[in-house]
Structure formats: C-alpha cells, structure tokens
Amino acid sequence: MGLPGSKALGGGLYELRDMGRGAGYRVYYTWVGDMIIILLAAGDKGSQERDIDLARRRLADLPDAP
C-alpha cells in the first residue's frame, strides 16, 4: 500500500510528488517492514532522472533493502 500521490518505480522504490503546490518537488522512499525510509528529498522534473538514479543507489546500500 502506498501513500496518496505516490508512484511505484519498481524494485521497492517509490516516488511521492508534491500534489499541486510549487515546482513539483519529489521525495523518494522505500518500505522496510513497517517503516518508511526516506532515500532522497529532491528537486523538480528537471532533475528527476538523476534523482531516481541516486535514490536507487541509496536503496541498494540499505542492509535490509527490499
């Protein structure tokens, strides 16, 4: 189950978008058990590809990564 405004990006990575405010900032996160782990609070659409790559690297570094 995700959060409102969230999108599954695969491999246990999720993107939460700012719904209708400002520049559309994003937060990338994962679930470990019943905890949400914030991997990256990031910029707007212009940096999205780089931000997702960084979030995926951080996810891979988690000891209990999904």
Task: Put a short name on every predicted segment.
Residues 17-66:
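Enriched for short, Lys/Arg-rich terminal
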Residues 1-21:
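A short, surface-exposed loop/turn module that caps and links secondary-structure elements
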